[in-house]
Amino acid sequence: MKTLIRPLVVIFVVLTVVTGLAYPAVMTVFGQAVFPSQANGSLIEKDGRAVGSALIGQPFDAPKYFWGRLSATSPMPYNASGSGGSNLGPLNPSLAEQVKARIAALRDAGTDLSKPVPVDLVTASASGLDPEITPAAAAYQVERVAKARNLTADTVAQLVAANTAGRQFGVLGEPRVNVLKLNLALDAAQAAH
């Protein structure tokens, strides 16, 4: 029995050192050296101060800002500790009621409802933390944002186009607009205007 315990303890200690200390240390050094921005949370700074992350959505509800996907996290929106599959199923009657309420909120905010509403403006994301919307969802909001900021719709549309990221490597994913980056670009454009 003692002959079995010694190798087990040695293997346990070696694996603990390798997987608990060495591997995390090597990955941390590698991440900081090769991908420093991503390793530190992809933080977005304004005036030398972190204002958010490019990877986690934030609530914007003022008419002068583009609004992101809705967050279904609890107890508050965009709560990273509450992230996870929180959408209702497509056959759940509560989903239809929530979508109707969200469309009414868009109408109350002065959004033109004569055009079809992009689905990502009225449904929550699976994680509840999506930082991006589709170009269609951004284009849908251009008139409202331009009016609230006293800018031309063309100026705002150009900012949307400038902040639209294409597919990764030209084939992966869909074109998308990071809401935080777009709203910061809007603030900068208005300050320069």
From Swiss-Prot:
Organism annotation: Burkholderia ambifaria (strain MC40-6)
Entry keyword annotation includes Transport: yes
Protein name: Potassium-transporting ATPase KdpC subunit
Membrane topology recorded in Swiss-Prot or TrEMBL: Single-pass membrane protein
GO molecular function list: ATP binding; P-type potassium transmembrane transporter activity
Subcellular location: Cell inner membrane
GO cellular component annotations of the record: plasma membrane
Function: Part of the high-affinity ATP-driven potassium transport (or Kdp) system, which catalyzes the hydrolysis of ATP coupled with the electrogenic transport of potassium into the cytoplasm. This subunit acts as a catalytic chaperone that increases the ATP-binding affinity of the ATP-hydrolyzing subunit KdpB by the formation of a transient KdpB/KdpC/ATP ternary complex.
Entry's family note: Belongs to the KdpC family.
Segments passing through the bilayer: 7-27
Quaternary structure and partners: The system is composed of three essential subunits: KdpA, KdpB and KdpC.
InterPro entries (alphabetical): KdpC
One matching Pfam family: KdpC
Keywords: ATP-binding, Cell inner membrane, Cell membrane, Ion transport, Membrane, Nucleotide-binding, Potassium, Potassium transport, Transmembrane, Transmembrane helix, Transport
Main localisation: membrane
